[in-house]
């Protein structure tokens, strides 16, 4: 449930990583609030290392998602979503930007979902974020 009509874009196919398809849907609700979901299909998400420890894969992906510099992790949690491994985390960027990003990552077989919301740290709109994150349905 996006707070508006999402823009859709296809991400380029990356042969070197085995990514077959990527899709991004996003809404810039206001100049300082954005909602997005991205997913990729790839055989690498079914690989033995990922299957052996999906939460380790999600933790490594979290580490790669956080920008260097003033970003600070303010929340992180392992979880599941419809029985699939999931992880949620949030980081805040101080300084002039003073924004935060909340992520929810889900590893569902050969598909990797990333939902995220970008917002002003001082104005997080947790109810809107919860509605957006909880509206995802895996069919």
Task: Kindly label every feature range from the protein language model.
Residues 23-56, 103, 114-115:
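A short acidic-to-branched-hydrophobic micro-motif
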Residues 32-34, 84, 98, 107-115:
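Coil-to-beta-strand transition motifs
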Residues 45, 73-75, 99, 113-116, ...:
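Generic preference for well-ordered secondary structure
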């Amino acid at each position: 449930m996006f707070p508006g009509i999402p823009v859709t874009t296809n991400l380029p196919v990356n042969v070197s990583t085995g990514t077959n398809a990527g899709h991004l849907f996003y809404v810039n609700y206001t100049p300082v609030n954005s909602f997005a979901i991205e997913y990729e299909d790839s055989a690498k998400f079914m690989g033995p290392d990922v299957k052996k420890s999906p939460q380790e894969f999600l933790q490594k992906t979290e580490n790669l998602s956080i920008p260097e510099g003033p970003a600070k992790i303010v929340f992180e949690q392992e979880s599941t979503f419809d029985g699939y491994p999931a992880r949620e985390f949030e980081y805040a960027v101080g300084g002039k930007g003073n924004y935060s990003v909340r992520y929810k990552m889900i590893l569902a077989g050969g598909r990797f979902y990333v939902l995220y919301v970008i917002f002003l740290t001082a104005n997080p709109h947790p109810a809107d974020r919860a509605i957006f994150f909880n509206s995802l349905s895996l069919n």
